[in-house]
Amino acid sequence: MEYFELMFKTAKELEESIVAILEDVDSIGIAIEDNFFDESILWDYIDKSFSERNYILIKAYFDRNVDIDRIIDKIRTKIKEIFGEAKVEIEYRIIREEDWTNKWKKYAKPIYLDRIVVLPSWEEIGNVEDRILIRIDPGMAFGTGNHPTTIMCIEMLQKYLKEGMDVLDVGTGSGILSIVAKKLGGDKVKGVDIDEKAIEVAKKNAEGNHVEVEFQKNDLIDGINEKYDIVVANLIAEIILKLNANVKRVLKTDGIYIVSGIVQEKLDMILNSLRESGFKLLEVKEKEDWYTVVAQNED
């Protein structure tokens, strides 16, 4: 199968908003590379500043049968509306699915945390001692464990999840957080994502890790009536803001709410939203300019 791969060179601080735009135009997969350099990409415009550390490469994937020129025009219009004349270079090419998969193998590395080791499915490893080993193949879904937001969510699950708790993972992507929750002793664990491809990948990853997790194609928490001890959502600020207004409906009393994918410019907005929704703020964690917030439902 073939896909369009769109590549965006942009300032690191624009990452969250660019990802939101890409999700809005129905991208089926997004990858983010820091300190990038790819000789196989021939850009129309090369600027020396793009090699500096504050620039990133965002890649988005679309089905081969879409009108890619129309999508690019829509993306450029949205970027101009939000950022004006901000520097964002866009190129695209056609790739095969196996090429996309092999690129993950180049950038995905083992992650060693307090109680957990996250390992790309194709990697071999020696003795992990008493750590929990989780193997992840992202396929066409977001989430290998390498991104700071994913790492922080895993750390917060390690801290707050007690054996027998029920966990809801909103925007599950590759299923990594759902699998972590189950491995840490979660009882009923459910992962939801609006992307059908992500659900397929998450199910395969759960099978590969020999855990039972329910994965469901869903728009955030629409139609979910069960209550959970923990809700974790590694999304972007604008979507978290929407989720904040209704998430108590699926949280038990004293339930823990973990949100990540927040840049500094949007942090106060999220904190104020949580306070207005009646949450008790427990902690704010930062890693590489990304923020994770943990709150508690006192209702």
Curated annotation (Swiss-Prot):
Keyword S-adenosyl-L-methionine: yes
Keywords tagged on the record: Cytoplasm, Methyltransferase, S-adenosyl-L-methionine, Transferase
Function: Methylates ribosomal protein L11.
Top enzyme category: transferase
Record's subcellular location: Cytoplasm
Matches recorded under CDD domains: AdoMet_MTases
Alphabetized PANTHER family for the sequence: ELECTRON TRANSFER FLAVOPROTEIN BETA SUBUNIT LYSINE METHYLTRANSFERASE
Subcellular location, principal: cytoplasm
Catalytic activity field: L-lysyl-[protein] + 3 S-adenosyl-L-methionine = N(6),N(6),N(6)-trimethyl-L-lysyl-[protein] + 3 S-adenosyl-L-homocysteine + 3 H(+)
GO molecular function terms listed in the Swiss-Prot or TrEMBL record: protein methyltransferase activity; protein-lysine N-methyltransferase activity
Gene it is expressed from: prmA
Gene Ontology CC terms: cytoplasm
Family annotation (Pfam families): PrmA
Superkingdom classification of source: Bacteria
Family per record: Belongs to the methyltransferase superfamily. PrmA family.
UniProt key word S-adenosyl-L-methionine: yes
Residues annotated as binding S-adenosyl-L-methionine: 150, 171, 193, 234
HAMAP family in UniProt: Methyltr_PrmA
SUPFAM superfamilies: S-adenosyl-L-methionine-dependent methyltransferases
GO BP term, pick one: methylation
EC number: 2.1.1.-
Name of the molecule in the record: Ribosomal protein L11 methyltransferase
